[in-house]
UniProtKB/Swiss-Prot annotation:
This is Phenylalanine--tRNA ligase alpha subunit. One of its GO terms (biological process) is phenylalanyl-tRNA aminoacylation. The keyword Mitochondrion does not apply. Gene3D superfamilies: Bira Bifunctional Protein, Domain 2. It is an enzyme of class 6 (ligase). Tetramer of two alpha and two beta subunits. HAMAP family: Phe_tRNA_synth_alpha1 (MF_00281). Belongs to the class-II aminoacyl-tRNA synthetase family. Phe-tRNA synthetase alpha subunit type 1 subfamily. The gene is pheS. Binds 2 magnesium ions per tetramer. Its EC number is 6.1.1.20.
Length: 330
C-alpha cells in the first residue's frame, strides 16, 4: 500500500510540475502506459491471495483515478493558459483610430443616365423599358424598316436564334409602349443598353442610348426643337450653348435631323438624331397619323458621359479600372 501511495504521489507531483503538453504526455506514459509504474502494479495482483488482490486492486484503481483527475486538471490548465496567451497576442487596441471603408460610387454612365432622366422627368416624360432581345417586328418592321429595306444596311446587327436580334436601338421600347398605351398622349424617355457590331475609341459593341417620344395632337417640329434645346442646355449647364438641327434621314422619322452643339474648340459636334414620327410608324401602332403627330429623338449616353467628364476614349468606361472610376466619386 505504501509503495502505491508513494508512486501516485510522485506521479501527481510530476503532473503538476509539467510546463507543456509534451512533458505532460510523457508523464502519463510513465505512469499509465503499457509499461507504466501504476500499470505494473496491477500486473502483480496475480501473485496475491484473493483477499489481498481485492483490497490492493481497489486501492490501485483508486490511485489511478486520482492520477487521471490530476492529469485532466493540468491539461485543462495548460489549454486555458494557451488560450489566454493567444487572446493577449491578438487583442485589439481600442485606442487606435478606426480605418474607414472606402465608399463605392455610381458609374459615370449611370450618373449621366440619372441626370438625363431627371431633366426629362421634370418636363413630364416618364421612363419606359423593354427587352434587350427583340423580334424583327419591333426592332425593324414597325419602325418603317421592312425586310430588304436599304436602311437595314446601316445597322451591323447581332442576330440570335429564330431571327431575333440584340436590339440595335431603344426605339422598340417606343413601339411596345404605344401598342400597350392604345391612345395618345404619349410622352416617354426610353434609356437602355443597345448592341451593334462596332468597336473603337468612340464605339463599343454594347453601348447606352436614351430615346424620347412625344405623340399628341398638334405636336410640331418647333416643340421638338424647344424641348431638346432646353434639355441639352440644362444638361451641360450652359444657357448660351449653340444648338443646330441639320437635315438628315432616318426611316422612322420624316422630316429628320441630326442635332449638333458648338464645342469649346469652335467646331460643331454631333450629339443626337431626331425627327417627326413617320406616319407609317404611327399606323403600325394603331395611331391615326391624321389626328396625331409626334417627335422622337435619340442620344448616346456614353457619348454624353464622355462630353460631360471630358473623357476621350469610350473604352475607359468599361475597363473597370478603379483609378479611373474613383474620379467620379461624389
Amino acid at each position: 500500500m505504501e509503495n502505491v501511495n508513494r508512486i501516485v504521489a510522485e506521479g501527481i507531483a510530476a503532473v503538476e510540475a509539467a510546463q507543456d503538453f509534451n512533458a505532460l504526455e510523457q508523464i502519463k506514459a510513465r505512469y499509465l502506459g503499457k509499461t507504466g509504474e501504476l500499470t505494473g502494479l496491477l500486473k502483480t495482483l496475480g501473485q496475491m491471495s484473493p483477499e489481498e488482490r481485492k483490497t490492493i486492486g481497489a486501492h490501485i484503481n483508486e490511485c489511478k483515478n486520482r492520477f487521471q483527475t490530476a492529469f485532466n486538471a493540468k491539461r485543462d490548465a495548460l489549454n486555458e493558459a494557451k488560450l489566454q496567451a493567444r487572446l493577449a497576442a491578438e487583442a485589439l487596441d481600442i485606442t487606435l483610430p478606426g480605418r474607414a471603408q472606402e465608399g463605392g460610387s455610381l458609374h459615370p454612365v449611370t450618373l449621366t443616365l440619372q441626370r438625363v432622366v431627371e431633366l426629362f422627368h421634370g418636363m413630364g416624360f416618364e421612363v419606359a423599358d423593354g427587352p434587350e432581345i427583340e423580334d424583327d417586328f419591333h426592332n425593324f418592321q414597325a419602325l418603317n424598316i421592312p425586310a430588304n429595306h436599304p436602311a437595314r444596311a446601316m445597322q451591323d446587327t447581332f442576330y440570335v436564334e429564330n431571327g431575333d436580334v440584340l436590339r440595335t436601338h431603344t426605339s422598340p421600347i417606343q413601339i411596345r409602349y404605344m401598342l400597350d398605351k392604345k391612345e395618345p398622349p404619349v410622352r416617354i424617355i426610353a434609356p437602355g443598353r443597345v448592341y451593334r457590331v462596332d468597336s473603337d475609341a468612340t464605339h463599343s459593341p454594347m453601348f447606352h442610348q436614351a430615346e424620347g417620344l412625344w405623340v399628341e395632337e398638334g405636336v410640331t417640329f418647333a416643340d421638338l426643337k424647344a424641348v431638346f434645346t432646353d434639355f441639352i442646355r440644362r444638361f451641360f449647364e450652359r444657357d448660351d450653348l449653340q444648338v443646330r438641327f441639320r437635315p438628315s434621314f432616318f426611316p422612322f422619322t420624316e422630316p429628320s435631323a441630326e442635332i449638333d452643339i458648338m464645342g469649346e474648340n469652335g467646331k460643331w459636334l454631333e450629339v443626337g438624331g431626331c425627327g417627326m414620327v413617320h406616319p407609317n410608324v404611327l399606323k403600325n401602332v394603331n395611331i391615326d397619323p391624321e389626328k396625331y403627330t409626334g417627335f422622337a429623338f435619340g442620344i448616346g449616353l456614353d457619348r454624353f458621359a464622355m462630353l460631360r467628364y471630358n473623357v476621350n476614349d469610350l473604352r475607359l468606361f468599361f475597363d473597370n479600372d478603379l483609378n479611373f472610376l474613383k474620379q467620379f466619386v461624389k
